[in-house]
């Protein structure tokens, strides 16, 4: 794909991401269905254009959509797809998402591993919006760092 086509694909994907976010803010079944379709369409474009960062974002958005409806197996699958994309292995947010889904699927050893990777990559701040559940769980599985939590 040429540079111009890549830029066009990126612009279309950015519009799709914005549309999906807007649909999700409706917090209705219709909004969820619309967001799902929009994300899948954008993901197809990102895959065709071989845009790894956009693929990671879209797989995570898809996983977040499933996670929000407690479809943890399907969310886990989307996050697993994300982590296998070039560059994602270094992304603590993807590890955090995998850790959360593994926690809810009761794969606790794997949850601890993924949450530890998230913690090492982003620090305690990555747990700021989860009510403490995942960080408290992680603290039961790791020794405290030398300077404390």
Where are these predicted regions, by residue range?
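TPR repeat positional signature
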Residues: 12, 16-19, 59, 95
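Structural motif corresponding to the intra-repeat A-B loop/turn of tetratricopeptide repeats
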Residues: 26-29, 69, 105
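Boundary/linker segments of alpha-helical solenoid repeat arrays
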Residues: 49-51, 87-93, 120-134
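Structural signature of alpha-solenoid helical repeat junctions
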Residues: 12, 31, 50-54, 74, ...
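TPR/TPR-like (Sel1-like) alpha-helical repeat modules
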Residues: 103-126
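Flexible helix-coil transition and linker loops at the boundaries of alpha-helical arrays
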Residues: 2-6, 43-52, 83-88, 125
């Amino acid at each position: 794909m040429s540079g111009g086509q890549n830029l066009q694909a990126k612009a279309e994907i950015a519009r799709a991401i914005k549309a999906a976010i807007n649909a999700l803010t409706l917090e209705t079944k219709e909004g969820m269905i619309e967001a799902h379709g929009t994300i899948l369409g954008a993901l197809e474009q990102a895959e065709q254009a071989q845009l790894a960062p956009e693929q990671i974002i879209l797989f995570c958005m898809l996983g977040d959509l499933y996670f929000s409806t407690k479809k943890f197996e399907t969310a886990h699958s989307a996050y697993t797809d994300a982590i296998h994309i070039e560059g994602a292995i270094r992304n603590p947010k993807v590890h955090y998402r995998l850790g959360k889904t593994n926690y809810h699927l009761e794969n606790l050893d794997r949850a601890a591993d993924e949450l530890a990777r998230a913690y090492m990559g982003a620090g305690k701040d990555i747990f700021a919006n989860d009510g403490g559940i995942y960080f408290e769980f992680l603290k039961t599985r790791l020794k405290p760092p030398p300077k404390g939590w």
